[in-house]
Amino acid sequence: MLAALIYTILAILLSVLATSYICIIYGVKRRVLQPVKTKNSTEINHNAYQKYTQAPGPRPWPIIGNLHLLDRYRDSPFAGFTALAQQYGDIYSLTFGHTRCLVVNNLELIREVLNQNGKVMSGRPDFIRYHKLFGGERSNSLALCDWSQLQQKRRNLARRHCSPREFSCFYMKMSQIGCEEMEHWNRELGNQLVPGEPINIKPLILKACANMFSQYMCSLRFDYDDVDFQQIVQYFDEIFWEINQGHPLDFLPWLYPFYQRHLNKIINWSSTIRGFIMERIIRHRELSVDLDEPDRDFTDALLKSLLEDKDVSRNTIIFMLEDFIGGHSAVGNLVMLVLAYIAKNVDIGRRIQEEIDAIIEEENRSINLLDMNAMPYTMATIFEVLRYSSSPIVPHVATEDTVISGYGVTKGTIVFINNYVLNTSEKFWVNPKEFNPLRFLEPSKEQSPKNSKGSDSGIESDNEKLQLKRNIPHFLPFSIGKRTCIGQNLVRGFGFLVVVNVMQRYNISSHNPSTIKISPESLALPADCFPLVLTPREKIGPL
């Protein structure tokens, strides 16, 4: 009896393995049929088709596909993709679980995917975690949904407020809010700071960034001691870390029971955030919306669209605010990384402070966004952090069968954009493993940049006559194409304001810089990261 049971179990297991392997191999061998373009024309002949084989790649195993190949690259999967490119070329296929994947590893291929084929490569992975984060439906998220007319409408609605142009009224509003919030931040830090003692300033940095976003988008500011506010700032940071991690569950959904506790935690984070947005922001604001008055902020625009557009629901508003207010976590983590590299290299901090001191001179004011163009080294440092951390671009998904670089790509294929290879290749950068902001600077062809008062920056140091390089084609921190990051100007602007206003007042150091551990390939830092020593500057201008 026992022997029969064992044989039955073995037979079932072998059957599962065989079925899995057959399905995987079918996915690997399947060819893509595409209509042939008529000779010397861009017109398509729908009566003639050509078969395209898929890009080469390693043979997958049953059940797990090629996931085992990344096992030794757990902390740096895109470094694993780069290593595999040495064997299989700049474009190759992988199978994760039963899901076909394509990895593109050079600039020309990335542009072909994101620009030339942006329409058919506009989907997002259908990961269970993505659904759990957004109320059971990832289409609620602007960043994680597939492309659609509703998605385009939401982007258009957000663009005016969330992509402020330089010197526009929204740009000036962002500058004022950022500077005022850093005054609150400085007072709060003064209550916590013990001279010479390290402090974990990440929670305080995140609160300041969260208030900048909530004031800019909702015209509401929250006290740092507000318990509910503290909680949602923490949960936003946890979610930012979560989205930047990979889990076997993403490709092996049968592992779901083992992730139930973790997924419940994710659901709790996101539902708590949405409850806060509903009770503390939307209910507070919807009673005062006036269709005849100009929009005060993004929340006004959303509430008006709720009244005027039948395709916009209350849930649409809640999820859009969750998406965009959550952008503060990216800013906070970026700032922490900048401060970490300053603590590791005091010369970087010194040069940033030289730019600051040259601009404010004897003026009684904080640095603002109008000073950004006169502070090329500071911006170069922020860009070098973005390059060095090489945060992954959210994967794309083929929404129909297509062809990339002569290879067939089947519908549903997940496409990984390997910007890590762009950021670390000696083809594009001199000594790419070295952290060096100067790589983003070049000799200025113009006079010294003007500050917000119209005077020369007057920097008498190595920063003299340097300007920020523009349009570096292989530097894509915010992606390109249809799904480029719509909030990148907010990230740059608020990130700049926090960094310079911290450096204007404090010297940043660490008792032991070697203990500052930074994960590769990620902008996200764990909630409990590294402490820093903030020493008030002896000379900070009249402030």
Swiss-Prot record:
Signal peptide range: none
Uppermost EC category: oxidoreductase
Residues that hold heme according to the record: C485
Membrane topology: Peripheral membrane protein
GO MF, one annotated term: oxidoreductase activity, acting on paired donors, with incorporation or reduction of molecular oxygen
Cofactor: heme
Start-end of Polar residues biased regions: 449-460
Stored Pfam families: p450 (PF00067)
Record bears the keyword Repressor: no
Keywords of the record: Developmental protein, Endoplasmic reticulum, Heme, Iron, Membrane, Metal-binding, Microsome, Monooxygenase, Oxidoreductase, Phosphoprotein
Protein location: Endoplasmic reticulum membrane; Microsome membrane
Gene3D superfamilies: Cytochrome P450 (1.10.630.10)
E.C. no: 1.14.-.-
Modified residue annotations for Phosphoserine: S219
InterPro entries referenced in this protein's UniProt entry, alphabetically: Cyt_P450, Cyt_P450_CS, Cyt_P450_E_grp-I, Cyt_P450_sf
UniProt function note: Required for correct development of the embryonic midline glial cells which are necessary for the formation of distinct segmental commissures.
PANTHER family assigned: CYTOCHROME P450 307A1-RELATED (PTHR24303:SF31), HEME-BINDING MONOOXYGENASE FAMILY (PTHR24303)
The protein's name in its UniProt record: Cytochrome P450 307a1
Species of provenance: Drosophila melanogaster
